[in-house]
Amino acid sequence: MKRGLAVRLAGLALLAATIAGCTGVRVPKAWEPLLEEVRAFEQRIGFRKTATFVEFSEEQGRIPFCGHVSRLYLPYSYEDPAILWYDVATERECRAHADGADVYFGTVEVLGESGAAVSPEVLAVQLQRFLYLVIHEDCHEQFEFPYGIEEALCNLIAYKAMAAFSEEKYGAQAREYIAIQRYTSRESERTRAIRTLYEQLAGHYARYERKEISDDALLKERARVFGRAERALAWKRGSLNNVGIANEMTYSRHYPLLESVYDALGRDLARTVAFFRRVDAIKPSQGEVMKEHDIASKDSLDFIRSYEADIARTIETALAGATRR
C-alpha cells in the first residue's frame, strides 16, 4: 500500500470515530438524488466535477490500515516519516510486530482517493458521515496543497457546506439539520482541545529530549494527558496514542488560520473556495521550499514542516491583500 494512501485512510477513520458518536439519521434508500443535490451545491460554491463516487460497487468492502510509532516519539502529523504504515488485513497482524510501539489500526468504508466508488459500506453510515465523505473527498480534488494544509481546509469547507446544504434542503427545524448543525458546531471546540492536548504533550516530549525526565516519567505524564483528554472528549479509555494524536493534529494544526479566512471573507463559501484556488496558484513550489530552507528530501520532516509554514504565510499575506480591497 502506498504511504500516502495509508495515511489518508487513517485520517478518514479518525473522522468516522467522531461522527459515529453523534445523533443522526441514516442515508436515504434513494441516495442517488441526494448525491446529485450535494454535487449541485458543490458546483455553486465553486467546486469542479470529480471522479469520486460516480459509480456503485458491491465489491469494494472496508479498507484496513495499520500504523506504528515509538511511544517515546511524538509525531508532527500523520505524514511524519517516523510513523511506519503497514499493509495488513487484521488488528492481530498489525499488533504482531509492534514490538512495544503504539499501534493505530482500523478500517474505513472508502479509499481516500479519486475514483472511489459508492459501496454498501458508504451507504450504511449516518447522514453526517455520508455528507462529510462526499464533500471532504471532493474538496481534495480541488486543490494541491500538502495534506497538513489540505486536510484542515477540506474539513473547514465540509463542515460549513454540510451546515449550509442541510439548512437549504431540510430547513432549520428538521432533525437532519439539527443533527448536522450540532455536529459541525462542536468541531471548532474539539479542534481547540486537540491543539491544547498536543501542546501539553509536546512540552513533556521536549523535556524528555533535553534529558530532563526519564522514559518512565515521560510515559506517566503522557498517560495523564491522554486520560484527561479521553474524559473531556468522551473518547473510549485507552483509545489515544501517539499515532492517533498525530492524525488528529493533521486536521487541527492549521484549522484556526483557515477558519479565520472564512470569517474574514464574510463566511461566504464561494469566496472561500475562490480564495484558496488563488493561494494554490501562487503558493511556493516544493523545489522553492527545498532551496530556500536547504532541504535535501521532500520526504523529510523538515520539508513537511517548512512547506506547511510557507503556505500558511502565503495564506496570511493573500488574506491581508484580499481584505484591503
Listing of model-derived features with the role each one plays in the protein:
Residues 1-10:
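Bacterial N-terminal signal peptides that target proteins for export
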Residues 7, 127, 250:
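Residue-level marker of regulatory loop/turn positions in helix-turn-helix DNA-binding domains and
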Residues 19-20, 160:
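Polybasic, low-complexity, intrinsically disordered segments
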Residues 49-190, 194, 199:
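Acidic/His-rich structured neighborhood in mature extracellular/periplasmic domains
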